[in-house]
């Protein structure tokens, strides 16, 4: 089935193609790999993406975004992939933004989507506990504790997990699987950066008595 863009989406695609071709190359990736760059992306270039409005591609117009949906996401990710461009776009805008849109309450959507669009926060989706993705495995627990929860467990291969500001963590509660937004610097959160073959920023994250 053909993927047809409207005029605005075609303009986005052309802008993204020019931007990535002019600003990214395999040489950039190799330099970050050789320097063992902790972020695995260039903050100044990420800020330019924010200023171009790309962080609002997935959010609806009512949420303050562009409302381009996943067609818009594809228009950016395709040329990004061709140049091996590293950025928080996939982890923050696509995975983090989607999780908040689909699972967040009204207050959470209003707060966090605005911060994503404004480039104020970087998210990482922490859901895997095995070497291969298996959503049925979730040994991380969230125990009711007064007005909140206490998280205990471990997540593996968390993309952007070593540099994210906020984590979206899957945990098992009495009600079943639940997602929690956790400050990456909260007490009890320990992040271990992983050396990945694709040089992506990834981490093993341990949660011990996280409130």
Where are these regions (language model features)?
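Amphipathic, small/basic residue-rich leader segments at the start of a protein or domain
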Residues: 1-90, 111, 115
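Short glycine/proline-enriched turns and hinge-like loops at secondary-structure junctions
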Residues: 68-70, 134-137, 160-164
């Amino acid at each position: 089935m053909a993927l047809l863009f409207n005029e605005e989406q075609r303009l986005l695609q052309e802008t993204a193609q020019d931007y990535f071709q002019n600003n990214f190359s395999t040489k950039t990736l190799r330099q970050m790999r050789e320097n063992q760059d902790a972020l695995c992306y260039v903050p100044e270039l990420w800020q330019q993406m924010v200023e171009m409005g790309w962080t609002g591609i997935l959010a609806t117009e009512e949420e303050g975004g562009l409302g381009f949906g996943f067609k818009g996401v594809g228009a950016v990710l395709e040329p990004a992939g061709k140049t091996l461009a590293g950025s928080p776009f996939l982890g923050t805008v696509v995975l983090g933004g989607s999780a908040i849109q689909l699972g967040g309450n009204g207050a959470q959507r209003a707060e966090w989507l605005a911060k994503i669009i404004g480039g104020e926060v970087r998210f990482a989706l922490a859901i895997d506990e095995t070497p291969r993705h298996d959503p049925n495995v979730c040994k991380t627990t969230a125990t009711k504790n007064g007005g909140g929860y206490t998280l205990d467990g471990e997540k593996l291969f968390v993309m952007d997990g070593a540099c994210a500001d906020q984590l979206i963590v899957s945990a098992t509660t009495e009600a079943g699987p639940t997602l929690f937004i956790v400050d990456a610097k909260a007490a009890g959160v320990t992040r271990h950066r992983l050396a990945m073959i694709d040089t992506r920023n990834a981490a093993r994250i341990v949660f011990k008595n996280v409130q």
